[in-house]
Amino acid sequence: MKEIVINKDDSNQRIDKFLIKYLKNIPPALIYKYIRKNRIKINGKKCKISYKLSEGDVLNLYINDELFLDISHNREFLESSSDLNIIYEDKNILIIDKPPGIVVHPDQNFKVDCLINRIKKYLYIKNEYKINDNTAFSPALANRIDRNTGGIVIAAKNSESLRILNNKIKNREIKKYYFCMVNGNMNKNSDILTAYIGKSKNENISKISFTEKPGYKKIVTKYTVIKETIYESLLKIELITGRKHQIRAHLSAMGHPILGDTKYGINKHNVYKKYPYQALCSYKITFDTFKEPSLLDYLSNREFQTKKIWFLDDEFFKHISKM
């Protein structure tokens, strides 16, 4: 039998969600079975899957010891790069400027060096990430951007901050702004574009429809033309909705794909010589007014932005970022 005392960071979440993160070596289906079979108790009593944990709760796990493999000593993240461009940090959150070319989470091609592992390494060195404590909160990202997109990513240092950030993003109380270079010239200097986005069944690609379709979700993208030449335009984008690949797929469907985009661009097989990555950067976020007291209410009406964008001249970026 193993006993766990719930701390502040792990409170205010469902017991099943906590156990799935904590018991990483046990399949979720087996965890649910253990709860149903009364092999997991809360404060000595039978619990429901939907039970929300409180600080000080005592979990009793009547599970075979061999299932508690020591996963806390996984130090693979320490092999990741130490390169981390921090825009802002406090005891609850980190705001990072992610360079293009780096994935945010491990995948089949990038199993070690990714943004979240760099953050874990940074916090571990600062003694803020306790890998020897299975109950300690593992740093988590509140938002994601594509591997070849650069810009702002927010990380939470504790579960309450993550919960607040997730709710703020869901309710569109954290606004995200991008700059991008696209092919051609837009029909209007500024506009709010509406369409519907869905997933391709056979490819990791998003499809756009300008009429409602089953399985498609509405997207809204606001743009302003900042500068244009005969062949290309610099756009400022505000995401009204935030779907995967929204900006890239939406602009491509409008006939103005982002330069350097090998998936949604004109040439899907070769990257533009001038643009080794897609010319898209999440350069600014703003927090709306916090209407209720919370752990992060000091961020109310705050604004954060990157210091530079790889595809723009530094002085020019300083000028247009104030617009």
Please place each PLM-identified region on the residue numbering.
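Ser/Thr-glycine-rich phosphate-binding loops at phosphate-binding pockets of nucleotides
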Residues: 149, 156-158, 241-249
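Short loop/turn positions at the edges of beta-strands in beta-sheet-rich folds
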Residues: 90, 149, 229, 239-241
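Pseudouridine synthases involved in rRNA/tRNA modification
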Residues: 1-33, 81-84, 205-207, 213-220, ...
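RNA pseudouridine synthases
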Residues: 1-201, 305, 312-315
